[in-house]
């Protein structure tokens, strides 16, 4: 029997609990400073201790994973801490499509894929001098909202950028992405595409809680006006969101279009979990500003199954367990090569 492995962060507990529930041996690549915490959980069979996650690429760590016949599950920490070249160089099988993680990290590739999928998107702003409306400025890759800021003009953009550089949050040469800010109800739509069944599943939706931008809503406007600080969008946690049933058909359609576009642009396509992120406007239409081409941390709120998976399965299934079940089925059907890269 193969083993399942991942990095000790993000959603690793959900992933390895799901793998253990499906009968797999589990390995966690764990930073030494967090060893005591992860040893609390009996479903983790082995800790592969490292000083930093960059050691995942080293011969020693790769050998341990290979000796355990392991399949590595990528998540946001992998995308945040490693370059696309590094991810693509991983020697053990990676669940899903490791090549599409480059498209998640690169803003121009990300926009190209979203346009190909016919997703409704906010306007991107080419340069600070073109800012003519409220914008949100983002970093490349999976930064978890850290270093994001809003601006109404080039002057405000430059002032806030300089402040973040001086505080060490962003670097001087960091390539920032400027996007029109679209108001609405934030929704992070979670999907799973099974290449074995050639079918898409809507897993659920969540909202993210960000500090300290959320706390500002509890401060009276006159006090806010007197503040010179830059609010942060650092993600602290997630909460569940159940969509109106009339919106579900559109959510499925977006997921299907995204999978089809992915198969055309970055073979073998969008296999496994992914998330389309955006806002619902007052007309009920969804505007997408991001996608994540792997499991997202928002699935952690459904560790005992989501409301929508309750409609598809007769037992509680987390996204971590759904991934493990796909691997298990692929092994049984001798189709593992269709689920890993």
From Swiss-Prot:
Annotated keywords: ATP-binding, Ligase, Magnesium, Manganese, Metal-binding, Nucleotide-binding, Purine biosynthesis
Cofactor(s) essential for the protein: Mg(2+); Mn(2+)
Catalytic reactions of this protein: 5-amino-1-(5-phospho-beta-D-ribosyl)imidazole-4-carboxamide + formate + ATP = 5-formamido-1-(5-phospho-D-ribosyl)imidazole-4-carboxamide + ADP + phosphate
Residue ranges annotated for the ATP-grasp domain, each copy included: 106-317
Residues engaged in binding 5-amino-1-(5-phospho-beta-D-ribosyl)imidazole-4-carboxamide: 10, 77, 238
Biological role stated in the UniProt entry: Catalyzes the ATP- and formate-dependent formylation of 5-aminoimidazole-4-carboxamide-1-beta-d-ribofuranosyl 5'-monophosphate (AICAR) to 5-formaminoimidazole-4-carboxamide-1-beta-d-ribofuranosyl 5'-monophosphate (FAICAR) in the absence of folates.
HAMAP family: IMP_biosynth_PurP
Family of this protein: Belongs to the phosphohexose mutase family.
Record pathway: Purine metabolism; IMP biosynthesis via de novo pathway; 5-formamido-1-(5-phospho-D-ribosyl)imidazole-4-carboxamide from 5-amino-1-(5-phospho-D-ribosyl)imidazole-4-carboxamide (formate route): step 1/1
PANTHER family: 5-FORMAMINOIMIDAZOLE-4-CARBOXAMIDE-1-(BETA)-D-RIBOFURANOSYL 5'-MONOPHOSPHATE SYNTHETASE, 5-FORMAMINOIMIDAZOLE-4-CARBOXAMIDE-1-(BETA)-D-RIBOFURANOSYL 5'-MONOPHOSPHATE SYNTHETASE-RELATED
GO BP field: 'de novo' IMP biosynthetic process
Any Pfam family: DUF1297
Annotated positions binding Mg(2+): 277, 290
Residues where ATP binds: 132-188, 210
EC number of the protein: 6.3.4.23
Molecular function terms, GO-annotated: ATP binding; ligase activity, forming carbon-nitrogen bonds; magnesium ion binding
Protein name, as recorded: 5-formaminoimidazole-4-carboxamide-1-(beta)-D-ribofuranosyl 5'-monophosphate synthetase
Co-factor remark: Binds 1 Mg(2+) or Mn(2+) ion per subunit.
InterPro entries: ATP-grasp, ATP_grasp_subdomain_1, IMP_biosynth_PurP, IMP_biosynth_PurP_C, IMP_biosynth_PurP_N, PreATP-grasp_dom_sf
